[in-house]
Amino acid sequence: MRVLAIMFFAVAVFNCVGCSIEKPTASQQESKSSSGWSLVAEDTLNPTQQLQQKIAVAAREALFERLMKRLAAVVETEGPAAAIAVCQSEAPTIAQAVGHEKNVRIGRTSDKLRNSKNQPPEWAVSVLKDRPTQAVFLTHPDGRFAALLPVRLKAQCLTCHGPIESIPMDVRQALLQRYPEDRAIGYAEGDLRGWFWVEVPKPPAETGG
């Protein structure tokens, strides 16, 4: 039972920054941003873009698995509040490692940031103004591919992101210490928490030379 509880909390902590991927509607139309990036519907992706999409999702899954494993270890040895420190100090390093291994840029962002360093990349800024609730895909003339994957809050995530009065005192104190300007509270189950973003380069086979 203890192992199950630890794994449950670890998944809960990660799912507060994880994502559920939703398909875009068939009516989604292609549009261009000022930076050259174009929104593109999933059902119009060419074979190369479909491969890039799979790489983006695989990178997100790899980050999920690695951080979940680390959080489970911390919860077992140090308790739930210690997971807050891991999210601050180790999650960025883990994301960088996954990005290097998968040859992508990957990160997390939100319109209500907990960590002010989780700002969106330039190509995502204008798209996020509309707070997309479905997965969004973009392409660039130079062959790059990008994805924004929404984060839906699960019930167990309320331990760290719910109304302030419902957050356990030790977790609340850890949040105050680590994130004095925290804005990521007051959520309810099912709320849009934020987004994973992934940028995939042009496949090597298509690079000029």
Role assignments for model-derived ranges:
Residues 1-4:
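Positively charged n-region of N-terminal signal peptides that target proteins for export
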Residues 6-16:
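Bacterial N-terminal signal peptides
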Residues 17-23:
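Bacterial signal peptide processing site
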Residues 23-156, 166-209:
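Extracytoplasmic c-type cytochrome modules immediately beyond a signal peptide or single-pass transmembrane anchor
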Residues 159:
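Short, cysteine/histidine-rich loop/knuckle motifs that typically chelate Zn2+
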Residues 163:
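Cys/His-rich metal-chelating microdomains
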